[in-house]
């Protein structure tokens, strides 16, 4: 028999009754039932119940073991009685009667309980992550993450993609976030950068004559911590294709990603055909470029119903500013004054003056609008709004007014809030869609200039003619995102492979041809030697797994994450370098002034 085990803790079944076996694992918990000891023994694969009665030669040792000790047990497999069968465990029809117990490793008093998975301070969980990872839910999430990545690799291979790895040490480039810099010992005073994404390398692969590239790529960005992003690093399914238009990318990747969700969704419905929603439409309907389509609320413009109306606040705004619009947020079943007042109070807590509303109720046989706005605009306009929005008795509608560019985000948040408060969101499904036709440029208010809205390497719709025109902010890009349940899970584009277009695109944001050659020299040179039309995208693996397993945040699907202050509490990173290391790198730290 093997030194440590003949079976795993998930392997034994009723067919093994009578067998002598050896198991090794962690003591999940110990229970004393009338002098008989029950030990739940756990390993990576599962759990087995071990029994040690007073007559067993292993009983004295069993009395000494404690939670999370690592032990080896020899014993005989016996069937449980019908009334003690545990149908929730794969091994629930048997138990192991212990004959011998060996302690392989004792454990100190635990700073973090494993059994029961109670809520515990996150810093403790991260400092003792090796204990936290023993918890069933987190352990299962990590295994699921690996399974999803394996399925992605198989899926990409099945549709003709080949995995290539690109460099980790590369040159710094302005791609939207700060780089993590690595000092060069051989070339003092110079630095490598960890890649924010393999963007330029994968495009260079297409220029080099490869096709259908993919990799599971680590990406590094020195960003301020955010709730929906892990500090430091993340992983993406990165891909690129040659001789394609954007529809080719969509038609290739949609079935593959749908299959990933369907295979791991535990029976939850997954969108069959992903809708393709233009960016402008998404903003106007949902107030977001990553809408949660499980929420059925769709906003509509109702400006005409308030123009010249008795509600002077809106009417005067419309009369004095042609950019002003009134958007309606219909709320099915929200027709109570209490709910409307709650929404209004929430809006004020968000720094807004309030949230105007109308709700409808039957008075006898007549359906009437109620609330201050209804009184001010009158019955005819109120009923016209109800008819346009398809609202009925017991429904409500909220209104947001102003220039859409300034209020659409708040309107989207109000839509989300109403949907959640009214339980309109079906949480047991995956709703996926494409967001397409993103703006190529946007206005940088801080610097008072035009800037790239998203990926500077995207192909602008309209080509050089559009880039040379006067209305740069109207240019759309051949750029697209994939969204699931309100989260952006992928982004991509058809690339700009023309040196002339590349220079012009950057000139419009204030960079010269010399700047382009300095910052993107490799790509710029490559495009002068025969570059095929190409495009691709990248999927955020961590977010996809988070959605699949239903985790609350990304740390629940990551092995050894940093905390929100970008500190690795387990390994003690970041940490000071030694004087000798700094000398080798020709670096002298500058003392930081304390506030």
Curated annotation (Swiss-Prot):
Region of interest (Aspartate), ranges: 199-202
Catalytic activity of the protein: tRNA(Asx) + L-aspartate + ATP = L-aspartyl-tRNA(Asx) + AMP + diphosphate
Binding residue positions for L-aspartate: 175, 221, 454, 495
Binding site for ATP: 221-223, 488, 540-543
GO molecular function, one term: aspartate-tRNA(Asn) ligase activity
Subcellular location(s) per record: Cytoplasm
InterPro entries per record: Aa-tRNA-synt_II, aa-tRNA-synth_II, aa-tRNA-synth_II/BPL/LPL, Asp-tRNA-ligase_1, Asp-tRNA-ligase_1_N, Asp/Asn-tRNA-synth_IIb, AspRS_core, GAD-like_sf
Site (Important for tRNA non-discrimination): 33
Domain of life of the organism encoding this protein: Bacteria
Record keywords, A-Z: Aminoacyl-tRNA synthetase, ATP-binding, Cytoplasm, Ligase, Nucleotide-binding, Protein biosynthesis
Enzyme Commission no: 6.1.1.23
Any Gene Ontology CC annotation: cytoplasm
Any one biological process term the GO annotation gives: aspartyl-tRNA aminoacylation
Record bears the keyword Nucleotide-binding: yes
Function statement: Aspartyl-tRNA synthetase with relaxed tRNA specificity since it is able to aspartylate not only its cognate tRNA(Asp) but also tRNA(Asn). Reaction proceeds in two steps: L-aspartate is first activated by ATP to form Asp-AMP and then transferred to the acceptor end of tRNA(Asp/Asn).
Quaternary structure and partners: Homodimer.
The family this protein is said to belong to: Belongs to the class-II aminoacyl-tRNA synthetase family. Type 1 subfamily.
The protein's name: Aspartate--tRNA(Asp/Asn) ligase
């Amino acid at each position: 028999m093997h030194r440590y085990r003949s079976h795993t803790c998930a392997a034994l079944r009723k067919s093994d009754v009578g067998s002598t076996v050896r198991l090794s694992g962690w003591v999940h918990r110990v229970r004393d039932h009338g002098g008989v000891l029950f030990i739940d023994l756990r390993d990576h694969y599962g759990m087995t119940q071990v029994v040690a009665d007073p007559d067993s030669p292993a009983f004295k040792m069993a009395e000494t073991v404690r939670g999370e000790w690592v032990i080896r047990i020899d014993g005989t497999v016996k069937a449980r009685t019908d009334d003690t069968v545990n149908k929730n465990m794969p091994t629930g029809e048997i138990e192991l009667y212990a004959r011998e117990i060996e302690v392989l490793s004792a454990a100190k008093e635990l700073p973090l309980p494993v059994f029961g998975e109670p809520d515990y301070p996150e810093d403790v969980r991260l400092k003792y992550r090796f204990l936290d990872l023993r918890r069933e839910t987190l352990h299962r999430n990590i295994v699921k993450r690996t399974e999803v990545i394996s399925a992605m690799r198989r899926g990409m291979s099945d549709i003709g993609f080949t995995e290539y790895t690109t460099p980790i040490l590369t040159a710094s480039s302005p791609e939207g976030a700060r780089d993590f810099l690595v000092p060069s010992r051989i070339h003092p005073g110079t630095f490598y950068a960890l890649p924010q994404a393999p963007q330029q390398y994968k495009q260079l692969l297409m220029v080099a004559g490869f096709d259908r590239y993919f990799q599971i790529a680590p990406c590094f960005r020195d960003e301020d911590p955010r709730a929906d992003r892990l500090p430091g690093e993340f992983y993406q399914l990165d891909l690129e294709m040659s001789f394609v238009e954007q529809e080719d990318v969509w038609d290739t990747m949609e079935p593959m990603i749908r299959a990933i969700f369907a295979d791991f969704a535990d029976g939850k419905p997954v969108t069959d055909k992903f809708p393709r929603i233009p960016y402008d439409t998404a903003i106007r309907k949902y107030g977001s470029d990553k809408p949660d389509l499980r929420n059925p609320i769709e906003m509509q413009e109702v400006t005409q119903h308030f123009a010249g109306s008795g509600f002077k606040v809106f009417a005067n705004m419309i009369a004095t500013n042609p950019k002003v619009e009134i958007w309606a947020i219909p709320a099915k079943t929200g027709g109570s004054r209490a709910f409307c007042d709650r929404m209004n109070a929430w809006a004020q807590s968000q720094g807004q003056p309030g949230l105007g509303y109308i709700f409808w109720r039957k008075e006898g046989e007549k359906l009437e609008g109620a609330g201050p706005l209804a009184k001010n605009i009158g019955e005819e306009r109120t009923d016209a709004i109800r008819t346009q929005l398809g609202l009925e008795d017991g429904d409500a509608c909220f209104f947001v007014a102003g220039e859409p560019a300034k209020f659409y985000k708040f309107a989207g948040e109000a839509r989300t809030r109403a949907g959640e408060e009214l339980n309109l969101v079906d949480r047991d499904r995956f709703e996926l869609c494409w967001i397409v036709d993103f703006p190529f440029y946007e206005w940088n208010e801080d610097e008072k200039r035009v800037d790239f809205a998203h990926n500077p390497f995207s192909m602008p719709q309209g080509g050089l003619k559009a880039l040379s025109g006067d209305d740069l902010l109207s240019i759309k890009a051949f750029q697209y995102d994939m969204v699931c349940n309100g989260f952006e899970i992928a982004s991509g584009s058809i690339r700009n492979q023309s040196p002339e277009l590349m220079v012009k695109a950057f000139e419009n944001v204030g960079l010269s041809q010399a700047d382009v050659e300095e910052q993107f020299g490799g790509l710029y040179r490559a495009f002068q030697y025969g570059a095929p039309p190409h495009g691709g995208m990248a999927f955020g693996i961590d977010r996809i797994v988070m959605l699949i397993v239903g985790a609350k945040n990304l740390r629940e699907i990551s092995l050894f994450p940093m905390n929100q202050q970008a500190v690795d509490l387990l390994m003690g990173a970041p940490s000071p370098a030694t004087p000798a290391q700094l000398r080798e790198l020709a670096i002298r730290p500058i003392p930081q002034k304390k506030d």
